[in-house]
């Protein structure tokens, strides 16, 4: 079960490193996330959120998450 808190984090957490530093996880290109499938996601919560982001994108559900970026 996906937790609402995790969806909010996917929408509001920015990538802390690399080419897409400062970009919200939900706005990362799917190809970039797929690169981590081959190379390994970061450990910890960031890696979990990145994997969740990829699942959201693969299933075409970005439209449900993007509005949460600005929802307070």
Regions found by a protein language model. Give the residues of each.
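DEDD superfamily 3′-5′ metal-dependent exonuclease/proofreading module
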Residues: 1-72
């Amino acid at each position: 079960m996906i937790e609402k808190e995790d969806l909010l984090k996917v929408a509001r957490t920015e990538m802390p490193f690399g080419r897409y530093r400062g970009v919200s996880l939900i706005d990362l290109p799917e190809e970039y996330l797929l690169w981590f499938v081959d190379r390994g996601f970061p450990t910890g919560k960031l890696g979990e959120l990145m994997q969740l982001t990829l699942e959201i994108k693969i299933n075409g559900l970005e439209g449900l998450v993007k509005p949460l970026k600005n929802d307070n």
